[in-house]
C-alpha cells in the first residue's frame, strides 16, 4: 500500500491492484500535422507531457501496475464514428475538419493511419493492454470495465490528452462505476486555451477525483518497485 500526495487530500492504494491509463497519446493529439493541429488547436506544449508520461509509465511498470493505452478513432470509412443521427457526427472536431477539408477524408483518426498511431516516443510493452475507443470516454463500447473488475482494480491513475475531453470523460464515467480516479496534472494537456486545463482539474479535484503530479507519483511508488521485482522473481 502506498500513499500518494494529491488534492484535495492524499489517497492510499495498492499499486498491483491499480492501473495507469494513458489516454490517446496519438499523433492526432500530440504531433504537428495531427488532427488537433490541423483543427486549429495548439499542440506546441505536448513535448514535456510525453516525457512525463514516459517517466510515469516506467515507475508504474516497475511497481507492478497494469498499464492501459487508449487510442481514439474509427474505421477508415468512419462507420464507427456514427452518421448524422449521432451527436458525435456533429460535435467531433475531427469529423467537422474533414467535412470542411475533403482532402483530409480518411486521414484523421482512421485506424491504421499515422494520425491514429501512438507517438513514437511512447511504446506499449508486453503485458500492457492497448484498447481502441470510439468516443471520448474509455468506458463507452470498450471492455475496460470488465478488464479492471476481473483484476480487482479500483484505482485508476490518468495521463494523456485531452484533459478536458477524453481524460475527464473517462475519469467521470469511472467515478459513476465506483472507481477512484487520479489525474497526474503535468502528464496531461488540454484541447483549447489554458483555462480549459484548469477548469478540468478543478472539476476533477472538487467533484470526481484527485489531482497529483508525476514527481509525487514516482516518489510514492519508489518503495513499491523492489517489492514488485521480488514477487516476479519468486514466481518465475
From Swiss-Prot:
Annotated catalysed reactions: (Z)-3-ureidoacrylate + H2O + H(+) = (Z)-3-aminoacrylate + NH4(+) + CO2; (Z)-3-ureidoacrylate + H2O = (Z)-3-aminoacrylate + carbamate + H(+); (Z)-2-methylureidoacrylate + H2O + H(+) = (Z)-2-methylaminoacrylate + NH4(+) + CO2
InterPro entries reported for this sequence: Isochorismatase-like_dom, Isochorismatase-like_hydrls, Isochorismatase-like_sf, RutB
Hydrolase keyword on record: yes
Residue numbers annotated as active site: 24 (proton acceptor), 133, 166 (nucleophile)
Pfam families linked to this entry: Isochorismatase (PF00857)
GO molecular function: hydrolase activity, acting on carbon-nitrogen (but not peptide) bonds, in linear amides
The protein's enzyme class: hydrolase
Family: Belongs to the isochorismatase family. RutB subfamily.
Biological role stated in the UniProt entry: Hydrolyzes ureidoacrylate to form aminoacrylate and carbamate. The carbamate hydrolyzes spontaneously, thereby releasing one of the nitrogen atoms of the pyrimidine ring as ammonia and one of its carbon atoms as CO2.
Protein name per UniProt: Ureidoacrylate amidohydrolase RutB
Organism of derivation: Klebsiella pneumoniae subsp. pneumoniae (strain ATCC 700721 / MGH 78578)
Taxonomic path: Bacteria, Pseudomonadati, Pseudomonadota, Gammaproteobacteria, Enterobacterales
Gene that encodes it: rutB
Amino acid at each position: 500500500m502506498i500513499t500518494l500526495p494529491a488534492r484535495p487530500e492524499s489517497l492510499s492504494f495498492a499499486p498491483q491492484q491499480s492501473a495507469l491509463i494513458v489516454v490517446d497519446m496519438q499523433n492526432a493529439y500530440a504531433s504537428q500535422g495531427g488532427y488537433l493541429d490541423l483543427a486549429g488547436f495548439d499542440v506546441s506544449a505536448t513535448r514535456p507531457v510525453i516525457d512525463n508520461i514516459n517517466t510515469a509509465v516506467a515507475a508504474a511498470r516497475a511497481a507492478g501496475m497494469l498499464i492501459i493505452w487508449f487510442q481514439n478513432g474509427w474505421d477508415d470509412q468512419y462507420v464507427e464514428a456514427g452518421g448524422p443521427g449521432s451527436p458525435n457526427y456533429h460535435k467531433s472536431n475531427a469529423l467537422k475538419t474533414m467535412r470542411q477539408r475533403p482532402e483530409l477524408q480518411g486521414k484523421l483518426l482512421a485506424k491504421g493511419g499515422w494520425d491514429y498511431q501512438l507517438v513514437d516516443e511512447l511504446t506499449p510493452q508486453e503485458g500492457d493492454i492497448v484498447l481502441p475507443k470510439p468516443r471520448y470516454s474509455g468506458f463507452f463500447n470498450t471492455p475496460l470495465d470488465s478488464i479492471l473488475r476481473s483484476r480487482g482494480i479500483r484505482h485508476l491513475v490518468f495521463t494523456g490528452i485531452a484533459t478536458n475531453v477524453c481524460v475527464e470523460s473517462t475519469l467521470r464515467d469511472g467515478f459513476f462505476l465506483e472507481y477512484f480516479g487520479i489525474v497526474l496534472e503535468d502528464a496531461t494537456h488540454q484541447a483549447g486555451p489554458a483555462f480549459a486545463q484548469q477548469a478540468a482539474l478543478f472539476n476533477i479535484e472538487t467533484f470526481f477525483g484527485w489531482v497529483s503530479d508525476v514527481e509525487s507519483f514516482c516518489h510514492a511508488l519508489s518503495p513499491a518497485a523492489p517489492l514488485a521485482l521480488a514477487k516476479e522473481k519468486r514466481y518465475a
